[in-house]
Amino acid sequence: MERGGGGSGTGSRPEGTARGTSLPGKIAEPGAVRTSQPNYRPQGMEGFLKSDERQRLAKERREEREKCLAAREQQILEKQKRARLQYEKQMEERWRKLEEQRQREDQKRAAVEEKRKQKLREEEERLEAMMRRSLERTQQLELKKKYSWGAPLAIGPGGHDACDKLSTSTMSLPKPTEPPMNKRLSSSTVAISYSPDRVFHVCPRLAPLGPLNPSYKSSPTRNIEKKKATSTSTSGAGDVGKEALSGGEASLVEKVKRGQRTATSLPVVNFGSPLRRCEFSGGIPKRPSSPVISKTATKAYPQSPKTTKPPYPGSPVKYRLPALSGQDMPKRKAEKEKSNKEREGTLAQQAAGPQGEEALEKHVVDKHASEKHAAAAGGKAENSAALGKPTAGTTDAGEAAKILAEKRRQARLQKEQEEQERLEKEEQDRLEREELKRKAEEERLRLEEEARKQEEERKRQEEEKKKQEGEEKRKAGEEAKRKAEEELLLKEKQEQEKQEKAMIEKQKEAAETKAREVAEQMRLEREQIMLQIEQERLERKKRIDEIMKRTRKSDVSPQVKKEDPKVGVQPAVCVEKKTKLVVPNKMEINGLNTCQEVNGVDHAAPETYPQDIFSNGLKPAGGLIHLDALDGKSNSLDDSTEEVQSMDVSPVSKEELISIPEFSPVSEMIPGVSLDQNGTGNARALQDLLDFTGPPTFPKRSSENLSLDDCNKNLIEGFNSPGQETPLNTFC
């Protein structure tokens, strides 16, 4: 629109210009008087139309500008809106990414925590399995020891039967680790030992003597103490490594050694007759494991046959051997358990590796197999005991049932006690493991905190170091900048000084050049002046020579009458307005040695010289001087200064010249010279001449203010201008 408006404006201009050109053409007619008024009206109309057009165009431009501004504001608002939407979208995307990252981190953290918990559970299971395997292995070893405990103590013809009898007697002892099974086995072995079949196979020589039987009977209190010992040993059987470090280990080892020495120190004796042994074979008790069994054994003792032969006499030690072995059995058993526990503790410590675990698993499998076998054997033995107890000495089935129920109750109680102890031990182990895990977690957290603190300290030190390095760099940069600025200022100062020096040098050179030029100009002027003065001097000399020639040619009588001095002088003197006396006196004017020209009037008297040679080196001219009128121009000052006027003057003697004191500057300069030596004739004639020419117009000057080099100065100062001079009467 602006361009269109501009085009319309430009298009309207030629119309206005054409209109303006056509209107003055109509007005400019000959005879039109009022030409100004018709010219003003069309110009005003044209200006009015142009102003309307300009206002319209300006209004259109304003509207267009407002539209453009509104459109631009709308675009800016739309752009801001788009930018805000884009920013919000970016922020939402960023928050979404942050949320996803946080969720991923939470999932990762949860997975790590779950994995850690899984590892802890696996570790707990592994430790529990190890503990269980170690316990099972300990029980298996104790079971093996229980079965292998009855070794042959004597060598004889019935050795195998004795070994079987001893093994069956030892099997009757209850074990602390497996009380139900051992009790069943013990009861079954007791029942078997008292059964007719078993008695039928027993060798009669191994039976002990009758009088020694009461010593082998065990009291109920003794059986209770044995149960307590077995329960305490059972409670300590689960502990793998702690019992090995107990304080009573040395005493137990000593007891084991002492029992072994007593067992090995027993002498081997010969048994009695077979008949006697067979007589006592049915009634000898085999150290029962419970008071009930001992009672049955005592009841069965009197039923032995009396027709048997008396036994051979033997040593009491022989018959006490089973009792001694029965007394030493718990000690040996406890010692073996302690040694096995120590060995199991070392094995449990070494079982952390995979090979140890595999070996433990193999032992567990073997132990389970042996437990199953032992359980089956125990069940069979229990059944056989239930069947054989009435035949072994119990006549009442109810009493046997009570005994069996009591045994089962005791086995159940012992099993519950062992289970409770096992649970307590597992709980204690779990608490210990949790405590260890808690301590390990605390240690890990402490180490992480220390590492975090160290990392923060390291970062802080690095930041401080970086900050210090940045400060040092900034200071170094500022110092370098300051030095650069100082060097720049110094260079600028040096450059300025150099420029000033160069300017001063240039000024000096210019001054010297100017002085040389001035001196050269003055020298040239002086030379020119000297040449001019020399030329003037030569001209004056020529004129003086001419004057002298004319004066010599004129034949004037030497005797002139005093009464007629004017008549003799008037026809010969033709004086112009100005005369010029040249005295070759040298003086300095503006530093130049020039010859001063002394200008005087016509009536100036010639200088008088008191001596032949004055201080300026000039000699007075002798003879008469005739002043004649010259044909020069007397009205111009240049001619009066440049030309020397000559006149015919009669020669005056030295004395006559000295006799004029009024007008001689030499008289003032040299006051000691007397002027009254000659007569007054010449003075009178000169006075008349001065009266004819007129009085002097220059003032007198004192001799104090004059020097020898300035003797003609009062003449120069007394020089009158042409307007002030009086015209002289010249005689033609």
Curated annotation (Swiss-Prot):
The UniProt entry, under Pfam families, shows:
MAP7
Cell compartments where the protein resides = Cytoplasm, Cytoskeleton, Microtubule organizing center, Centrosome; Midbody; Cytoplasm, Cytoskeleton; Cell projection, Neuron projection
Compositionally biased, Low complexity: which spans?
Answer: 347-357, 375-386
Predominantly, its location class is: cytoplasm
Tell me the keywords, alphabetical order: Acetylation, Cell projection, Coiled coil, Cytoplasm, Cytoskeleton
Residue ranges of the region described as Disordered:
1-64, 95-123, 157-186, 210-244, 279-509
Q: Which family does it belong to?
A: Belongs to the MAP7 family.
Q: Which GO terms describe its molecular function?
A: kinesin binding; microtubule binding
Q: Which GO terms describe its cellular component?
A: axon; centrosome; microtubule; microtubule cytoskeleton; midbody; neuron projection
Please name the gene that encodes this protein: MAP7D2
Kindly list any coiled-coil regions of this protein: 51-146
Instruction: Give the protein's biological function.
Output: Microtubule-stabilizing protein that plays a role in the control of cell motility and neurite outgrowth via direct binding to the microtubule. Acts as a critical cofactor for kinesin transport. In the proximal axon, regulates kinesin-1 family members, KIF5A, KIF5B and KIF5C recruitment to microtubules and contributes to kinesin-1-mediated transport in the axons.
Record note on quaternary structure: Interacts (via N-terminus) with microtubules; facilitates microtubule stabilization. Interacts with kinesin-1 family members, KIF5A, KIF5B and KIF5C.
Where is there biased composition of kind Basic and acidic residues? Answer: 49-64, 329-345, 359-374, 404-509
Species source reads: Homo sapiens (Human)
The Gly residues compositionally biased stretches are 1-10
Q: Which cysteines are joined by disulfide bonds?
A: none
Gene Ontology annotations of biological process type: axon development; microtubule cytoskeleton organization
Name the InterPro entries on file: MAP7_domain-containing (IPR051483), MAP7_fam (IPR008604)
Name it.
Answer: MAP7 domain-containing protein 2
Q: Which domain of life is it from?
A: Eukaryota
